[in-house]
Amino acid sequence: MKPFGAWIVMGILTLIGDGVAFAQAPERTIALYQKLADSTVGDHVRGKVVFENRQKAGCISCHSVDGSRTGVGPDLASIGFKYDRKRLVESVLEPSKMIADGYGTTLIATDAGQVFNGVLHRVTDRFVELKTTESRIVRVPLDQIVEQRQGTISLMPEGINTTISAEEFVDLIAYLETLRASALLPIHSAGFLEDVPLARKPVAFKPFFRSELRFDHPVAIAPLPNNHDQFVVAEQGGKCWLVSKQTSSKELLLDISSRVRVGGATGLLGIVLHPRFPKDPRVFLKYQINDKGRITTIVEERQWGANSQTGRELVSPRELLRIVGSTQDHNGGSIAFGPDSMLYVGMGDSGPQRDPEGHGQDLTTLLGKILRVDIDGKDKDLPYRIPGDNPFHEHPTARKEIWALGFREPWRISFDSQTKDLWVGDVGQDRFEEVAIVRKGENHGWNVYEGFAGFSNQFRPKETKFVPPIVSYPRSLG
């Protein structure tokens, strides 16, 4: 079996795009096209023709513009509202520079010598499905896969400036700027923000630690109780540091970088100390690993210990939750203890884009949910106790750890210290972000709703009350 590199050299992965042609056209540089787009007003009507002409840009082959989301690439119905002109130009000219989450490529090699390249569409215990540039679904049985890896090159071909003229390119950008569907949706809710006004008083953001303290992609911080000086900082790559604000010193507590799977939405994402710390010296982590090709979320308990050689460290790992995902996307982020001393876990739908398996509405899976467990007790065959007042504790088929459902990517969760409310920031699909207050047993809508707007009825349950967000806003606002 040849490694991927050998197959690529042989030219099998032709779906990636013709980088040679791009390199052979120095007179049509990216800089020139960028300059033209910045200084010239194009014709959006002609640009629509370029978009749809498969012998020209051919964008229609992979992208829908009507919200149908039928292609292998993102739906572009709102792209003009989401991106400014500079970002549009960069995305078209250099598609691999910043690939949208959920649209990265996956390369699979089989024991028969076949190589497949596409966007992950579906993953099960028996097979993997990829969607190709022709929006064709390719199914590969798991027992035939000998190698699987994430690609770094977009399925959208490089070198569009070698296939269309400069005038056509400017027209294409003008057409993309007109695609502003989300701005026109009739959303009537006090919680929908069409714009964010400037604050009456400016707010200054200042570094929390001294400038000499540097971190590599810090994603979470946990203060030591009754201690205004020391904090634990977690880095996405798998390291945890004990940091002193006063002395600007940092001490390595944990390094699981060899175990953690680091990517756009994966890595060491959450850390929290036991509510009775340091009397109870347990620390809890949430991170992702690659387990035989499946992205798997781990919620783990460790002990705050001492090492005569290295000082303090997090030791004695004990796995609490192991949640197998479908793709690398939407694994949630935070874990937090509530005022009831229960551990709450935000878990995303795990993809692929648009939640085609309906994880958010499926009570038999932990994906797309807020979970609640008691880590101070144990049930039979479980390393934790399921609280008796969890809303689905008596449900015949539901996972009893579920506290609330209908989430896409609950990246951050936090409890209000005054009201005790659970606030959740949920990342949207193509159009809207949302912030919600989440209570016991509530259904927050994904993928039936995205924010306040309808998204899909495919997995709409019967006779279900959906709880809208407190605030929702278009992605163009940040």
Where are each of the predicted segments found?
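Post-cleavage N-terminal segment of exported redox proteins
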Residues: 2-44, 53-54, 65-68, 82, ...
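Electrostatic cytochrome c docking/interface patches
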Residues: 25-54, 72-74, 84-87, 111-114, ...
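Primarily the internal scaffold of c-type cytochrome electron-transfer domains
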Residues: 33, 42-45, 71-103, 151, ...
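C-type cytochrome heme c attachment motif
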Residues: 49-65, 74-94, 104-107, 114-129, ...
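Structured surface patches comprising rigid loops and adjacent beta-strands/short helices at the edges
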Residues: 135-155, 213
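Intrinsically disordered, low-complexity linker and terminal regions at domain boundaries
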Residues: 147-171
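Beta-propeller domain segments
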Residues: 181-203, 226, 234-237, 268, ...
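Acidic, Gly/Ser/Thr-rich repeat motifs that build Ca2+-stabilized beta-propeller blades
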Residues: 185-354, 412-415, 420-428, 478
